[in-house]
Regions:
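Short, well-structured hydrophobic secondary-structure segments
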Residues: 29-74
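Short, flexible, solvent-exposed loop/turn segments with mixed acidic/basic and small polar residues
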Residues: 6-15, 99-110
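Surface-exposed, low-hydrophobicity interaction/linker segments
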Residues: 57-99
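Surface-exposed, polar/charged interaction patches used for macromolecular assembly or partner binding
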Residues: 4, 19, 91-100, 155
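Short, surface-exposed beta-edge/turn micro-motifs
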Residues: 17-21, 104, 110-115, 120
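Glycine-rich, aromatic-bearing surface loops/beta-hairpins
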Residues: 111-157
Length: 157
């Protein structure tokens, strides 16, 4: 007599959010960038808990800055695309491991420096003034609920 397993199929969340991709015009330290951003906006970005991704060989941290705009009632998050710290947990002994000491949240967009998200379902990134001499124009990028970055943004919100 064999037991047949039955699975309850939950309603799938097929929603999508838009994030903004931020590319720096020139290399600049984070503290200078956010000092400049805070100077020209009414709301102020503060460093909050880093996003931590645990791997088999490395733990990667990504910096995160957050601000709340009282007029639009939106919470904005800047997340670094490239890991700022990688802590090695154990020695890699495989020749072709897919894990390295540097990780990108958006692997296909390694030229992106920051990912901008907000709490509103309809992202309006033009409300954030960015220093023109440091940052290129924000590019909107759709994220489906199946992507790892979507899950991370939802978890840390």
């Amino acid at each position: 007599l064999s037991i047949k397993k039955q699975y309850l199929k939950l309603e799938e969340d097929l929603s999508e959010i838009n994030v903004g991709l931020i590319r720096l015009a020139k290399p600049i330290p984070e503290h200078e960038l956010f000092f400049s951003i805070n100077e020209i906006n009414t709301f102020k970005f503060k460093r909050v808990e880093d996003i931590l991704i645990k791997g088999e060989y490395f733990d990667h941290s990504f910096s995160r800055y957050q601000a709340y705009d009282k007029s639009s009632k939106n919470c904005y998050n800047f997340i670094s695309n490239k890991s700022i710290v990688s802590i090695q947990k154990k020695e890699q002994n495989q020749l072709f491991s897919d894990e390295s000491n540097i990780k990108f949240l958006l692997n296909l967009h390694q030229d992106v420096d920051y990912i901008l998200s907000n709490s509103d379902m309809f992202a309006e990134f033009s409300l954030i003034l960015l220093p023109e001499n440091f940052v290129f124009q924000t590019q909107e990028y759709p994220l489906s609920s199946e992507e790892e970055l979507y899950q991370l943004i939802q978890y840390y919100e």
